[in-house]
Amino acid sequence: MANDFLFTSESVSEGHPDKVADQISDAVLDAILAQDKYARVAAETLCNTGLVVLAGEITTTANVDYIQIARDTIKRIGYDNTDYGIDYKGCAVLVAYDKQSPDIAQGVDRASDDYLNQGAGDQGLMFGYACDETPELMPFPIYYAHRLVERQSLLRRDGRLPWLRPDAKSQVTVRYVDGKPHSVDTVVLSTQHSPDITQAQIREAVIEEIIKPVLPAEMLKETKYLVNPTGRFVIGGPQGDCGLTGRKIIVDTYGGASPHGGGAFSGKDPSKVDRSAAYAARYVAKNVVASGLARQCQVQVSYAIGVARPINVTVYTEGTGKIPDAKIAELVQEHFDLRPKGIVQMLDLLRPIYEKTAAYGHFGREEPEFSWEATDKAAALRAAAGL
């Protein structure tokens, strides 16, 4: 990529229909893990006008009220009025869970290459990424896209902008100069709203109360603001679009700044490497950058179903590494256990922590639940590299 360019990332709020689905799926997962931490869960959700469908595969000893979990999640998000697109009190909830296939279970429970360790729940490839564009070691565009819709939710909930409704989207286009963020070129923010507010009022409030308090002032240089560019956004949420689990995988990760292996996260227990190995790859990449070994780090891992050890662990630093990428990859394999069971133990993943991850990004959030955001291995990596 050239050193001078524009790059765009987007995010969506907790009230976006796909994120409603993600949060219900992860709320189901959390409720099960709270009772049965070794459960096998693949919980999918569809939500439309007045309807929620729960399907997938679950094998557990837990006793869970799935219908109530779906309603409680919709209520927490803020859909408590039929005018908003769905109402937690009146929506229909259909439950259609099966058990995990025994053919899959036998490979997960006992790895073909390591009797003592859990095999991967499926084949697949996963990526982790980190860079020094923000203190959280995330790409600038996706980090601030998340913060914009997060603030929209805050102002909706605390009543400062009472005409806001739960559904919203943001998009941030950043101008890079010499490969580094220089300024914000364009901000798009679309927010669902009550019908009794004018476009002019929405535009002024969004720019002054949401955008400017979030984005660094020094980055706002001739920035273009596109606020509700269609002119009206009253119909939203699951009424405006059908929501499905796993349809916001770029929002969930790095906003397009890194490749994606294709596997979604929400609703999946940690035996699914789509989720756990992607978290581990972020953990690795963040520690590499935090150690000073590179300014950018992309990590790819891949697995075969029923096999514990990753097929490959590949590191790419885009020319920013202090030592060769192959040497960094060797250090990674020495300092991180990337077998599925090793990942679960390393990151303490058998906890009911996942509903919080299902909106505003799985990465770049330094909260206690996000163990994969720790940089506790940076010093050891730096020492091992001789820096």
UniProtKB/Swiss-Prot annotation:
It catalyses: L-methionine + ATP + H2O = S-adenosyl-L-methionine + phosphate + diphosphate. It comes from Cupriavidus necator (strain ATCC 17699 / DSM 428 / KCTC 22496 / NCIMB 10442 / H16 / Stanier 337) (Ralstonia eutropha). It is found in: Cytoplasm. This is S-adenosylmethionine synthase. The keyword Metal-binding applies. PROSITE patterns: ADOMET_SYNTHASE_1 (PS00376), ADOMET_SYNTHASE_2 (PS00377). Its main location: cytoplasm. Residues 100-110 are annotated as: Flexible loop. Homotetramer; dimer of dimers. Belongs to the AdoMet synthase family. SUPFAM superfamilies: S-adenosylmethionine synthetase. Catalyzes the formation of S-adenosylmethionine (AdoMet) from methionine and ATP. The overall synthetic reaction is composed of two sequential steps, AdoMet formation and the subsequent tripolyphosphate hydrolysis which occurs prior to release of AdoMet from the enzyme. Pathway: Amino-acid biosynthesis; S-adenosyl-L-methionine biosynthesis; S-adenosyl-L-methionine from L-methionine: step 1/1. InterPro entries: ADOMET_SYNTHASE_CS (IPR022631), S-AdoMet_synt_C (IPR022630), S-AdoMet_synt_central (IPR022629), S-AdoMet_synt_N (IPR022628), S-AdoMet_synthetase (IPR002133), S-AdoMet_synthetase_sfam (IPR022636). Keywords: ATP-binding, Cytoplasm, Magnesium, Metal-binding, Nucleotide-binding, One-carbon metabolism, Potassium, Transferase.
